[in-house]
């Protein structure tokens, strides 16, 4: 993924939740927090095909994504990525996204310790994912960046 500066790339790398702004048919913005991964010079955000974010991306692909350096909570800088998005439901994209997300969120020492400390919540997490899957299929919002901005 190409960013304007090393700082922009670092914030994108350490960000945990992206906030995607999509537009309704009346051009009203909606903001949705979603887990994400940088994949093939794009931002991929994982969700379900029934969500408002996906419906709005399908109607109007213009999006902005905000990412903050969450590992440094006192750092006020935010990266805004503007671009066009598409909704992907193909198996290849899903598998690649799951791999990137597992490496980013689950398969690091800090997260492994956290998962073990909260093992009693695994059933609850599994039920949440089953309920979401019952409503629709997994979907990736793939954002092709056109502009990066470092906001103070």
Segments the model singles out, each with a brief description of its role:
Residues 1-17:
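Extreme N-terminal tail/first-helix region
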Residues 8, 53, 93-97:
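Amphipathic alpha-helical interface surfaces
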Residues 48-51, 145-147:
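Secondary-structure transition/turn motif
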Residues 58-63, 103, 107:
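Short, intrinsically disordered, mixed-charge
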Residues 74-152:
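Charged, gly/pro-rich active-site loop segments
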């Amino acid at each position: 993924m190409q960013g304007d500066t090393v700082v922009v790339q670092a914030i994108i790398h350490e960000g945990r939740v992206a906030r995607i702004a999509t537009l309704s048919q009346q051009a009203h913005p909606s903001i949705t927090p979603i887990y994400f991964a940088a994949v093939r010079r794009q931002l991929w955000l994982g969700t379900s095909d029934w969500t408002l974010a996906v419906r709005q991306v399908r109607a109007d692909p213009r999006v902005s994504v905000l990412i903050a350096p969450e590992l440094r909570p006192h750092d006020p800088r935010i990266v805004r990525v503007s671009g066009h998005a598409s909704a992907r439901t193909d198996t290849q994209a899903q598998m690649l996204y799951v791999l990137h997300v597992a490496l980013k969120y689950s398969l690091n020492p800090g997260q492994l310790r956290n998962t073990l400390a909260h093992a009693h919540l695994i059933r609850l997490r599994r039920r949440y994912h089953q309920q979401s899957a019952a409503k629709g299929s997994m979907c990736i919002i793939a954002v092709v960046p056109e502009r990066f901005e470092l906001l103070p």
